[in-house]
């Protein structure tokens, strides 16, 4: 379970870093070479036991959902979605999110004022605000996009040590807080059904349908709020 979580996070962050000309391999081992920063090791140690009694993710390299409750039980006869399809759908949805909210997202990244000592507190504050009113697929996409922006900003400001930490924080949060909702709402199969094959971009062409399923509850004002939480008062 934890490996699938981290694999999705690392793939998305690697993709976002590559869009800015950076390589994940430049930063993935920075934390391991430091002795004064235990956050990543602790997070990775906690991740496997973060969710007690919940089924594994609905991915090809994980067991099929076993004993899931609610309407997700109807997925039993469906083909398991490959991990690669989930990764691709996340990439495409993240790109579409940033394209649609380009100006607000630019404000977010330009207002980040982080240091190695305050980064986790800022990450936690923003993510808690993002999901304050509940979870939906659009907010999960925003969560990944925020993590990607945070990594890029960290590298731009020569704080490469934060990249692997951010990956661990995201994987842990995904396990602890988002996976139960994901399983109760059809698993990653449903996400790929909604977002696969660049569905978000296609839906944007039908403007009246976009807000109904892509970013329900996640407005431009919400994105700006994420940025404002990082501003020094």
UniProtKB/Swiss-Prot annotation:
One of its GO terms (molecular function) is protein kinase binding. The keyword Heme does not apply. CDD domains: Bcl-2_like. A motif (BH4) lies at residues 4-24. The chain crosses the membrane at residues 210-226. A motif (BH1) lies at residues 129-148. It comes from Mus musculus (Mouse). It holds the Pfam family Bcl-2. The BH4 motif is required for anti-apoptotic activity. The BH1 and BH2 motifs are required for both heterodimerization with other Bcl-2 family members and for repression of cell death. The loop between motifs BH4 and BH3 is required for the interaction with NLRP1. This is Bcl-2-like protein 1.
């Amino acid at each position: 379970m934890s490996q699938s979580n981290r694999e999705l996070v690392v793939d998305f962050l690697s993709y976002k870093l590559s869009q800015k000309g950076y390589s994940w391999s430049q930063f993935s081992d920075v934390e391991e070479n430091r002795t004064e920063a235990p956050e990543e090791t602790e997070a990775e140690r906690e991740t496997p036991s973060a969710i007690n009694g919940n089924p594994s993710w609905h991915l090809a390299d994980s067991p099929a959902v076993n004993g899931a409750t609610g309407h997700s039980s109807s997925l039993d006869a469906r083909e398991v979605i490959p991990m690669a399809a989930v990764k691709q759908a996340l990439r495409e949805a993240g790109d579409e999110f940033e394209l649609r909210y380009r100006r607000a997202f630019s404000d977010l990244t330009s207002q980040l004022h982080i240091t190695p000592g305050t980064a986790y507190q800022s990450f936690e504050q923003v993510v808690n605000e993002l999901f304050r009113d509940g979870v939906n697929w659009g907010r999960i996409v925003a969560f990944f996009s925020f993590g990607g922006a945070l990594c890029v900003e960290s590298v731009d400001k020569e704080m490469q040590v934060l990249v692997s930490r951010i990956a661990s924080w995201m994987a842990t949060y995904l396990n602890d807080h988002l996976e139960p909702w994901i399983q109760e709402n059809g698993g990653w199969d449903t996400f790929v059904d909604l977002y696969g094959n660049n569905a978000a971009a296609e839906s944007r062409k039908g403007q009246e349908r976009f807000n109904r399923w892509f970013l329900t509850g996640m407005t431009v004002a919400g994105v700006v709020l994420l940025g404002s939480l990082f501003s020094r008062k």
